[in-house]
């Protein structure tokens, strides 16, 4: 068996399946998709000769609805609860030696009850793999990482990935803590966007103290709060009030105005937007900001409809890129802290 394992948000398996299928077709690769709603993962089975290409072109950063992508090695069913280890050892590829081991389960109603089993099984499997020469004695991030994903007590997927090409969090979920002073839980969305959609080098270069930013539809102020923690100066646009600790903050200027109509008096370094509005309207307005040179970098959310969410996502991003009419770096992801939405990062490469 060969192909890809991709984790996703529960309920978005059809969207991830459609995304994988469309992108595989663009690569000229045929494959079989397995996706069941609310299972929290999708399988793409294909010819072994195509797996490397898929992993390079469809790794987690390039896919919108995938939290993690793995090389699929085997699917083991009807495992005996008295000895799950022997079949797993037998099913592993002859090479390589793995540098790390993650025991996982889908982030779904079906998978979450398996968390206890995953913890205990990892403690049992790890020394056996080391004794067999299949797992390094010390952590080796440069070596492939083995993933054992429990779908039930007797059903397991075996996968692997290179640490440099994969999400750095188990299940593809960053564990962020909401600080008590945060004005709203939406702050977690922007925090996750910054660590997911930008590389460490990009964050260092593009989020420098003193930069100017605009937050459209800012109230109650979660995204503004994240930006000022990066020491950016923020103009917060909203007719509604901001919450403490933003009131009278030296880095915050609150302008009571409509975020869709307000225009900046001078070009900004950043613009962020988490307004609840039709996704096409948001995409079109965001494109205006880049086309007019009102900002260099932006992060915004697109609230998705209940049906045809992949089609709407693709249409909105295509319209945005076309109407922006500038050279772009464009990335999008359904984040763990997103709901029925995706988060988009765009940067004007010409400035």
UniProtKB/Swiss-Prot annotation:
In its keyword annotation, does this UniProt entry include Cytoplasm?
yes
- Residues annotated to bind S-adenosyl-L-methionine: 186, 219-222, 238, 258, 274
Q: Which UniProt keywords apply?
A: Cytoplasm, Methyltransferase, rRNA processing, S-adenosyl-L-methionine, Transferase
Q: Which Gene3D superfamilies match?
A: 3.30.2300.20, 3.30.70.2810, Vaccinia Virus protein VP39 (3.40.50.150)
Disulfide linkage: none
One Gene Ontology term from the biological process aspect of the record = methylation
Q: Name one Pfam family in it.
A: RlmM_FDX
**Known catalysed reaction(s)?**
cytidine(2498) in 23S rRNA + S-adenosyl-L-methionine = 2'-O-methylcytidine(2498) in 23S rRNA + S-adenosyl-L-homocysteine + H(+)
Chief location of this protein within or outside the cell: cytoplasm
Subcellular location, record wording: Cytoplasm
Q: Which GO terms describe its cellular component?
A: cytoplasm
**SUPFAM superfamilies, A to Z:** S-adenosyl-L-methionine-dependent methyltransferases
What does the record give as the active site?
303 (proton acceptor)
Return the EC number: 2.1.1.186
GO terms of molecular function: S-adenosylmethionine-dependent methyltransferase activity
Q: Which family does it belong to?
A: Belongs to the class I-like SAM-binding methyltransferase superfamily. RNA methyltransferase RlmE family. RlmM subfamily.
Its annotated function is as follows: Catalyzes the 2'-O-methylation at nucleotide C2498 in 23S rRNA.
Task: Name the PANTHER family for this protein.
Answer: RIBOSOMAL RNA LARGE SUBUNIT METHYLTRANSFERASE M, RIBOSOMAL RNA METHYLTRANSFERASE FTSJ DOMAIN-CONTAINING PROTEIN
- SUBUNIT field: Monomer.
Protein name in UniProt = Ribosomal RNA large subunit methyltransferase M
Q: Which organism is it from?
A: Xylella fastidiosa (strain M12)
